Amino acid sequence: MLWSRFIQPRLISLACGSKPFMVQRTKIVPLAEGNVLEIGIGSGLNIPLYDKDLVKKIIGVDPSTEMQSLAKKRINESPVDVELISIDAAEIPLEDQSIDTIVCTYTLCTVPNPQGVLKEMKRVLKPGGKFLFSEHGHAPDESVKKFQYKLEPVWKFLADGCHLTRSIPEILNKSGMKIHTMETMYLPSTPRFVGFNYWGIAINH
């Protein structure tokens, strides 16, 4: 289908690469170190933000081959080795405790089974390893929240399964990883229904 194969991936990459979202990415991605697993690497928007002096290798997981094709230029220009794996993040083909840092930006909103994905993250992340996240989700204001619930069925179709109402702290707390730091705010120049942002660091225990 033309929409899902060509138009939708490019629109999502464009929206997720807008300035407010890129500013949020710069707050967490440079903190990654060692062997890094990026969940939902998509079109590779985070790749230029990694610190080449801290990161040994980036393993990017994404089920969308269309998105991965959009990432090729950034991968080719990266000073850090990037390996792409085309698979659902609920079945990560990596050994237990083999990853130092996991990065996840604007992906927990879309995965069909966030708890299953986080269970896999916890399995492959070393004890004491960092989970760096920046996600949009459930807004605190009642009027915004009501609009999110009304819009969500249509939004999920338009935005490849993206949910507007997921509570990121609740999802993380259920995973067994401990939230070390977390900040929230409405992103500037962004519609409030999609602009309430959670970002921070969780530690694997």
Task: Explain the meaning of each model-derived region.
Residues 15-35, 45-49:
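Conserved alpha-helix/loop element of class I SAM-dependent methyltransferases that forms part
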Residues 37-39, 43-91:
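Class I SAM-dependent methyltransferase SAM/SAH-binding core
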Residues 87-102:
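A short acidic, Gly/Pro-enriched loop at the edge of an enzyme's catalytic core
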Residues 100-113:
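A short SAM/SAH-binding and catalytic strip from SAM-dependent methyltransferases
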Residues 128-136:
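Conserved beta-strand signature within the Rossmann-like core of class I S-adenosyl-L-methionine
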Residues 160-176:
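Short alpha-helix
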Residues 177, 184-205:
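Core SAM-dependent methyltransferase catalytic element
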